[in-house]
Amino acid sequence: MGGFTKEAKKGYIEVAFNGSLASILLDTQFSVPAKGVTAIFGPPGCGKTTLARCIAGVQRLPNGFCAIDGEIWQDETTFRPPHLRRVAYVFQLPILSSHLSVRRTLLYNASNSEPTLIDFDGVVELLGLAPLLERTPSHLSKTERQRLALGSALLGQPRLLLLDDPLIVRDRSAKCEILPFLERILQSLALPMIYISHDITDIERLADHLVMMKDGTVTAAGPLNVTQSDPALASRSEAAICLDTMVGGYDGRYGLVKLRLKSARFLIPAVPLRPGARLRLRIAAGDVSIACEPPRASSILNVFRARITASLPHGDAEVTLVLTLETGHSGVPLLARITRRSFDALRLSIGAEVFAEELCGKLGDDGMR
C-alpha cells in the first residue's frame, strides 16, 4: 500500500491501523471515496471484523489513523469514542430488546437524535416495517429482525453505516429478501457504507469499491472492477468483472438492451429498460474469448479491441488474461479465461493487442443500481 499518507481528505475514508488485537495482527492501510459501498473482503479469520471494530472505535490500536470525509476520528493525539463517531454498526446477529415492539424500538432510537438523515416515518417506509410495528423481536423472521436493526441504526442519524457480514447466516432466498432493502438505503440516502463479507457474490451486487484482506493485511484496494482484476480474485474459478453501464436504448425486433460504457457498446438479451438507467453487468472470465483479428462473420455480438496487461496460470490447462478495453481516455478492465494451447497457438504475450469477444454478460439479480 505504498504512497498512503495519513491525512484527512474531504470526500474520502482514510484508514491505517498497525498492531495486534486479540491475536489478530493488523497491517492495514487504504483510502476510498466516502460515498457508495466499500466492501472489505477476505477469508474468515483474516481480520475483517477487527478492522471494522477499530473503524467504529469499539477497539483501539495505539498505532492507528481513521478519518471520514475530512474529519479525524483517530490519530497520534486524538481518539474519538464510539458514541461521538456516529457510526451505525450492524452486527452479524442483531442485538434487540426482546420486550419492546418494533414501533417502540424505533421510537427509542429516534428519540436520541435530531432527524438530519431520516425520520421515523421515512425508516418505516424505506424498510417496509409498517406491517411489523406491533410485533416483538420473537415474532419476527431473521430477515425482519435484520431490517429492524437497520432501521434502528439509521435513526441514530449516522455518518457511516458499517455492516459486519449481515448475511452470513442467510440462505440464498433470505439474502435475496434483504439485499433489495440495502440497495434502497443506498439509493435513498447519501450515506457511505462499509460492508464486511467473505461472499464475493454479495459484493459483486452491492459494492462500488473493494478492499481485499489476507492474514490481517490489506492486499489491494480500489474501484470494484479494478480490484477484481487483481491476481487474488482473477485467479478464482468464478472470476468476473462487474461494469456499471447505462441503458442507451432497446432493439425491440431482437429483444436486446443497448448498454453504454464510455465509448463501448453492449447488446444484452433483456426486457425493455428505462433509457438512462444505470445497470450493473457481470462478465465472467469464462465468457470471454480472444481473437487476434476482428471476426468477419460471428454470432458474438460484443467484440472489443483490447490489450493484454497480465496473464495468470489457472491450473494446468488454462490461463486467465487480464485485459484493458480500449474505450476512450481510460481503459476498462476485463478478464478472459482460455486454454494454454490457445494462448500458445495465438502467440499471445503481455502488451499484445487483441479482440475480446464477450458471449453474453449477465445482469445482477435485479440488474438496476
UniProtKB/Swiss-Prot annotation:
Catalyses which reaction(s): molybdate(out) + ATP + H2O = molybdate(in) + ADP + phosphate + H(+)
InterPro entries hit by this protein: AAA+_ATPase, ABC_transporter-like_ATP-bd, Mo/tungstate-bd_C_term_dom, ModC_ABC_ATP-bd, Molybdenum_import_ModC, Mop_domain, P-loop_NTPase, Transp-assoc_OB_typ1
Enzyme Commission number(s): 7.3.2.5
Annotated compartments: Cell inner membrane
Domain Mop: 297-367
UniProt keyword Cytoplasm, yes or no: no
SMART domains: AAA
Disulfide bonds listed in the record: none
Family note: Belongs to the ABC transporter superfamily. Molybdate importer (TC 3.A.1.8) family.
Self-association and partners: The complex is composed of two ATP-binding proteins (ModC), two transmembrane proteins (ModB) and a solute-binding protein (ModA).
Protein's recorded name: Molybdenum import ATP-binding protein ModC 1
